[in-house]
Amino acid sequence: MRRLLAAVLTLLPCAVHAETVTFGLDWKAEAEYGGYYQAVATGIYAKHGLDVTVKQGGPQVNHTQLLLAGRLDYNISSNSFLALNFVKENIPFRTVASMFQKDPSVLIAHAGQGNDTFAALKGKPIMISSDTRVGWWNFLKARFGYTDAQIRPYTFNLAPFLSDKTAIQQGFLGSEPFSIKETAHEEPVVMLVADAGFTGYASLIATSDKRIRENPDQVKRFIEASIEGWYSYLNGDPAPGNALIKKENPEMTDALMAYGRESLKKHGILDSGDAAKDGIGAMAAARWAAFYASVRDQGIYPAGLDATKAYTLQFVNQKAGMGK
């Protein structure tokens, strides 16, 4: 009885003093957010004194606006462009970790059409979203000579792609390729934009400068717990996180989540590059500087922008969670 009482008392401080945190995703619950759901389901956030609510996003949800309005404490920024936008627009928020070392964005084509390299797609119609047009599309224009005349609207619906063997569209590594295989029973050509040399980070965690300044301990605990959740999800049993994902997003199947998780692992989306030595979430000032220089030269951002204001290295590169 005494031993049980001692164990309960040991847990009480975390339960009583847990800080409430609201965290927004940039899309619906799926394996690409598995680490966060794993951290909730397995008590990793609770162990760090945090009571975290994960709010999924979607096509009609602008969590960046909710973050700026103070209705979210932390938010997933899809890519490095959003972080630089904060600087350009003088908005006092910044990136505190980059969970994805590689952007999982892909271009997808049908096999047997000669559309199996980025270079081969020059001059051909490609379905992309408005966000992509102002994002990594500019990298492809500079790298491979693509033009805006190639752009066709992408509505996040696979029907146009499936009905046209010459069609090419954007997608995400762990999602659309699987759906195409399941629906059309064909193996599509999948080209990862990061493999073509795109150096932008992806799935970045953003918060306010005010929070960083006034509550750095919470930021540190949130980032460390999120990183631990990712190591647990990738290297351990993902079932707890997957169960929460399915509860949040009933469209998710076990097969799709397994495919998404395996895609993250196979391509080193989280743990390659600097993350291999410094841990998941790693960022490097040199990489940020190089990315800014490239998008500045493409005319996306003005010269003289202080890219160091887009991020802080205060909470990463500390090998948190490695070996767990």
Label for each model-derived stretch:
Residues M1-L4:
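Positively charged n-region of N-terminal signal peptides that target proteins for export
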Residues V40-G43, H48-G49, R71, I76-N79, ...:
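Sec/Tat-exported extracytoplasmic proteins
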Residues E19, N85-V96, D148, S163-T166, ...:
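Ligand-binding "clamshell"
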